[in-house]
């Protein structure tokens, strides 16, 4: 199975995402001006500050050539993971519901966060063996918001996949939401960084299960 | 044609920037200030003013969380 990791001007976590994806499969970088997704089985939209995050985080990246292809890929059922800035890009592209706003504390905040897995049977969490995830978060625009009708629909369809554990919601996200998927279940975004938690050297390997789940989903679909 | 687009957080959405400024004003002796909200101003020259609304919907604002107001200077 092969992951394609997008690279925008201003991306800064694409190399770690590539490294994490290579722990469970093959992976290559896809440049923002390319429309060709090179036959990859899943897409990772990485963290960073795409196009400088001018105007709003993720607002300009969503109109890049590669994102046109990613939107078509997602609409065709392809697996897409958005991490941090990637989550913002997917929300701006309307592949995921809601929006990300400046942190309630108005600060760029970097800390290890504890996450509760709310939905276990998803293409992005199926390889998780239970318990909380300990994953770093680092952002200034991570306050998740969706209006009331959207939130109700998300709850009905099991779209809230991850929540910050009690006391961990430093950015002021609505209902402690840390990660959401689309209604079809093939697009997932989260603010914390699973790609930075794949090696004991950095304190946690809890992020690996996200990538391993995606591999299971792709290979299960092939059988 | 010159145009201005005023973009502000939708009512009811937490606006921590506005709150921080509102808290700072009384400390400087400015009393009786309420409902401080902070948004963005986009100034632009356009040939066709009818394009402004789709511009706002697609890029200048995020209609899920922001209201926008178009002001034309003929």
Predicted segments with their positions:
Chain B
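Long, contiguous binding/interaction regions
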Residues: 2-41, 47, 53-74
